[in-house]
Structure formats: C-alpha cells, structure tokens
C-alpha cells in the first residue's frame, strides 16, 4: 500500500508532519470502528482494517527512517527484512570509534563532556546523512536508489548508537 496516497500526500522524504497529523486525524474520524458500532459485521471488520492501515501509514510516514524505507519499497527496494550490512569502511571505522567511546564513558574524568561530545558528533553525522538521503531518494536511477538504501542503513546504525548512548547516560545518573 502506498501510504502517501492514503494520506493524499506527495511522495517526499521531507514531509510536513503537521499536515500528516491533520490528515491522520481526518482519516481516523472517517474510518474509526466506533462509527460503525451499529453496522454489519463485515463493515465493522472493514473499519478495523482501515483503521489499522491508517495507523500503520501514520507510524511509517512520521518517522524519517521508516518513511525512507517506504519510499524505497515503492521503487522496488525492500529493506524491511534484509540482512545486508553497510560496506562503507570509513563509516564502519567511525562506528567502531563511537562504540569504543561509548564503552569508555563511565571511566572518563568528565562523563558529561564525553556524552555531550557524542551527542554532537552523532547529530552532525545524522544531519549529513539525512541531507544526502533527501537528495538521493527521489531519484529513479537504480544506482542512486542503492546509495539511498545504504544511507538508510547508516541511519539505522545511528539510531542504535543513539539508543546505546542514552542507556549509557541513564546508567550514570
């Protein structure tokens, strides 16, 4: 299912989330199962199915990574069940450095500074990757779309690192 069509939005990585939220509320009002309380069993089932589609679509489109995955899937590149890893050795080396820094936080003289430095580093890298992705994901060229897929994989790694950083931060306080 094309969630952009469901929400009457143009397929775009850069999405106005306020418009998305408004369309979500409109669709929910139209298909919510409570509106079909006195309807036939079939209509009730359809309302539940439509509500599930609207919820899935909203959750997919509101998050940049899942939105990018959806856009790629619409172009024939399915990342949802893959085990392909990033092959960019520079990125992998950077990731190893970040993981080492994460492991050393508790032993630092100033863990707050180390955490702040990692937050800043992650944010800058994520911003760069996201900007590149926004440029490439609209392409119709297979090679450019594969580059976009690699950028999505990198963003997934960054999400995992961010979660690890937050756990490390929570463990200190």
UniProtKB/Swiss-Prot annotation:
HAMAP family per the UniProt record, alphabetical: HscB
Domain of life: Bacteria
Keyword Chaperone in record: yes
TM stretches of this protein: none
Disulfide linkage: none
Gene3D superfamilies (UniProt xref): DnaJ domain (1.10.287.110), HscB, C-terminal domain (1.20.1280.20)
Positions of the J domain: 2-74
GO cellular component: iron-sulfur cluster transfer complex
UniProt entry tagged with the keyword Chaperone: yes
Protein name, per record: Co-chaperone protein HscB homolog
GO MF annotations, alphabetized: ATPase activator activity; protein-folding chaperone binding
Pfam families referenced in this protein's UniProt entry, alphabetically: HSCB_C
Biological process annotations from GO: [2Fe-2S] cluster assembly; protein complex oligomerization; protein folding
Assembly: Interacts with HscA and stimulates its ATPase activity.
Keywords, in A-Z order: Chaperone
Family note: Belongs to the HscB family.
Role, per record: Co-chaperone involved in the maturation of iron-sulfur cluster-containing proteins. Seems to help targeting proteins to be folded toward HscA.
Source organism: Shewanella loihica (strain ATCC BAA-1088 / PV-4)
